[in-house]
Amino acid sequence: MNSKFIERHEIKLSETHSKMIISGWGKDAFENSVVERITYLSDGLKVKGYLAYPKDHSKKYPSVIWCRGGAGNKGAIDTFTARGIYGQLASWGYCVFASQYRGNAGSEGHDEVGGSDVNDILNLIPLADEIPQANGNLWGIEGWSRGGMMTFLTLQRNHNFKCAVLVGAISNVEEYANKNTKLKSYYENLIGKEKLEQELGKRSAINFVNELPKIPYLLIHGAADDTVSPMQSIELVEKFNEYDIPHKLVLPENGDHFLRKNRKEVDELRKDWYEKYLKKKRPEDRS
């Protein structure tokens, strides 16, 4: 089998940075996980990303795709942050796959922010076949901010995920772009003004809820988020109700876009969600 991986390098941190990881994400996140920088093939492009997995290789673990926020290099995940975020998730008992998206952090191609870059997420899936401890048949997906949009676009095209976690997710891209002049200019330069409304509509989950799989969705959105309005998640949930899509909406009081003051609550919600839907046996999972 031809490998989809081009490069894999384990992240090694200085003693000072290692202590900072333990302080910020916990001892387990550092001691019980391995996080790697990877380069993989996506539509013939060399794309950068990350891979994380538990140190214990004695069994297989559910797989989770984690979708970053930001556009271009703004929001790209550096190695220190990756060691914390992905190491924590791996320490909970998951194999984690994450993309920087094409055109970013040294990746080839150009970031279309919800266009062909969605393939960079879908092309993470076959990588699980090359990780012995990864269960490539049991997937969850998580997205923050722009990563929420990417998560919805991925789920529109692939219904093989068991659950999803969305944090501060953009579900109405047109509305968000109208309030974010930098992003709107980015899209105008990328798409052109003539097709702008049409293309932003295609990227907006609020317009294709009926095409999403009916899996359990955890939506967390800071009630005081002034970057992506919590109304984006509130209005999406109204659509979820119309189509009987199972979900839980949590609006942490005084929570900002990054939920800095709510990290413990958010981590517990995420951990419990994955535990419930990726690990606990349900009747439909039994053979």
Question: What are these model-derived regions, one by one?
Answer:
Residues 112-132:
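Alpha/beta-hydrolase active-site loop
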Residues 148-159:
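Short glycine-enriched nucleophile-adjacent loop
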Residues 13-58:
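N-terminal cap/lid segment of alpha/beta-hydrolase-fold proteins
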Residues 57-61, 66-109:
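Short substrate-entry loop that stabilizes the transition state in hydrolases
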Residues 133-145:
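Alpha/beta-hydrolase fold nucleophile elbow
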Residues 68, 234-287:
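C-terminal catalytic histidine-bearing segment of alpha/beta-hydrolase fold enzymes
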Residues 76, 169, 173-214:
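Mobile cap/lid helix-loop segments that gate and shape the active-site cleft of serine hydrolases
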Residues 212-213, 219-221, 225:
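Short beta-strand/loop motif that positions the catalytic acidic residue
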